[in-house]
Swiss-Prot record:
Signal sequence interval, chain numbering: none
Gene that this sequence comes from: glmM
Catalytic function, reaction form: alpha-D-glucosamine 1-phosphate = D-glucosamine 6-phosphate
Superkingdom, taxonomy of origin: Bacteria
Name the record gives this protein: Phosphoglucosamine mutase
InterPro entries: A-D-PHexomutase_a/b/a-I (IPR005844), A-D-PHexomutase_a/b/a-I/II/III (IPR016055), A-D-PHexomutase_a/b/a-II (IPR005845), A-D-PHexomutase_a/b/a-III (IPR005846), A-D-PHexomutase_C (IPR005843), A-D-PHexomutase_C_sf (IPR036900), A-D-PHexomutase_CS (IPR016066), Alpha-D-phosphohexomutase_SF (IPR005841)
Free-text function comment from the UniProt entry: Catalyzes the conversion of glucosamine-6-phosphate to glucosamine-1-phosphate.
Record family assignment: Belongs to the phosphohexose mutase family.
Species whose genome carries this gene: Delftia acidovorans (strain DSM 14801 / SPH-1)
Length: 447
């Protein structure tokens, strides 16, 4: 069935407009609660959130909706998305709920869910919830109503989990790290994780006010981190996004490394330690240079649809552990069930400390192909798939690039945008081809 509310990463939108309203959040939680109770007499869910001011409102509405369906609730407060996933599993909860719009501005928010195993839920589950939303509510009797309480020291429990993924024989003593938490969910947790492992920590983007999440800081605005690393003469810079599930790194020279490069580094580190790495999963957007570099070392490479949930699904299908996206979502399934910016950072820092190699030394064999990504805003009713001129232009560009580049055109799963990506060894050629395709895409006909 076609989904009305769920996108590629839960439900997301502008606060105060459907579906990100308190009345819908209550209805949603009630519907989810009814779905849970079909298999479990007394479900218990965890609810975590980032630092957006609207999180209070949505948290209360979700709590009421679950309780009204006879579901118990445990409130975690501000906590990274992967922290909610971890605690859902650790607390043996039925479901984990995250209130966050990830890297979006404060005026957006969203709601997403984790299974009892701490993994993203399949499309079929979301469709079952959407069906339940079309049905009349069935309010639980007073004696059957759910209860709500707060989990003490949720942040501390997650901090210990993150530290447990770092080799106990190693330390970060003598390493200076600038940490940028994007004024988001990891604003207290991230500095503590690195500090407790011995690092000298400089914190930026760690003063949320409810309105400044992701504003000129974090993984979507790494310029501030680059400047801070240089100014503080730090060894590394760690950039997270608002819910801390993605990671970008900066080295001592101020060079920025994206998720594609870090995925290669994670694989290369394991190979250097004698571990088997049969393959890694990227996405349709993963830079060709990473694919070439991995295959040159005997590591298979498969592309999934864009979105960490699809990378995860492909990893399970292949039986592999490593995957990721250029945006910084990285998966190491032997460490965590979902993408985790802090855990990923610790794996990379561990590789550097253990080997004595810098980020640039680890990645000297990976020269990323120039990749141009243009966003074309579509007007309501425009159907780019019926644009025959775009189809013809795309085929022409593919013929021009041959084996030295790629073209990818896809609709955003969270915004009314068409993403046009062209990758080529020649940057000027990539820019010219992308501009050509974007121009044609703007004239897409009405549906």
């Amino acid at each position: 069935m076609a989904r009305t509310y769920f996108g590629t990463d839960g439900i997301r939108g502008l606060v105060g407009r459907s579906p990100i309203t308190p009345d819908f959040a209550l209805r949603l939680a009630h519907a989810v609660g009814r779905v849970l109770r079909r298999k479990e007499a007394r479900p218990m869910v965890l609810i975590g959130k980032d630092t957006r001011i609207s999180g209070y409102m949505l948290e209360s509405a979700l709590e009421s909706g679950f309780n009204s369906a006879g579901v118990d609730v445990m409130l975690l407060g501000p906590l990274p998305t992967p922290g909610v996933a971890y605690l859902t599993r650790a607390q043996r909860a039925s479901l984990g709920v995250v209130i966050s719009a990830s890297h979006n501005p404060y005026y957006d928010n969203g709601i997403k869910f984790f299974s009892a195993q701490g993994t993203k839920l399949p499309d079929a589950w979301e469709e079952e919830v959407e069906q339940a939303l079309t049905e009349d509510p069935v309010w639980a009797d007073s004696a059957a109503l759910g209860k709500a309480r707060r989990l003490e020291d949720a942040a501390g429990r997650y901090i210990e989990f993150c530290k447990s993924t770092f080799d106990h024989a190693l330390t970060l003593k003598g390493v200076k790290i600038v940490v940028d938490a994007a004024h988001g969910a990891a604003y207290q947790i991230a500095p503590k994780v690195f500090h407790e492992l011995g690092a000298d920590v400089v914190a930026i983007g760690c003063a949320p006010d409810g309105l400044n999440i992701n504003e000129d800081v974090g993984a979507t605005h790494p310029e501030a981190l680059v400047l801070a690393v240089r100014a503080n003469k730090a060894d590394f810079g760690v950039a997270l996004d608002g819910d801390a599930d993605r990671l970008l790194l900066v080295d001592a020279a101020g060079r920025l490394y994206n998720g594609d490069e870090l995925l290669y580094l994670l694989a290369a580190d394991r190979l250097a330690r004698g571990e088997a790495v049969p393959g890694a999963v990227g996405t349709l957007m993963t830079n060709m240079a990473v694919e070439v570099a991995l295959k040159s070392q005997g590591v298979g490479f498969v592309r999934a649809k864009v979105g960490d949930r699809y990378v995860l699904e492909e990893l399970h299908r292949q039986g592999w552990t490593l995957g990721g996206e250029g945006s910084g979502h990285l998966l190491a399934l032997d460490k965590h069930t979902t993408g985790d910016g802090l855990v990923s950072a610790l794996q990379v820092l561990q590789a550097c400390v253990r080997s004595g190699k810098s980020l640039s030394q680890w990645l000297s064999s990976v020269q990323l192909f120039p990749q141009v990504l243009l966003n074309v805003r579509l007007q309501p009713g425009q159907d780019w798939k019926r644009n025959t001129q775009l189809e013809e232009a795309t085929e022409a560009v593919k013929a021009e690039l041959g084996d030295t580049g790629r073209v990818l055109i896809r609709a955003s799963g969270t915004e009314p945008l068409l993403r046009v990506m062209v990758e080529a060894r020649d940057g000027d050629q990539a820019s010219r081809c992308a501009e050509r395709l974007a121009s044609v895409a703007k004239n897409s006909p009405a549906a």
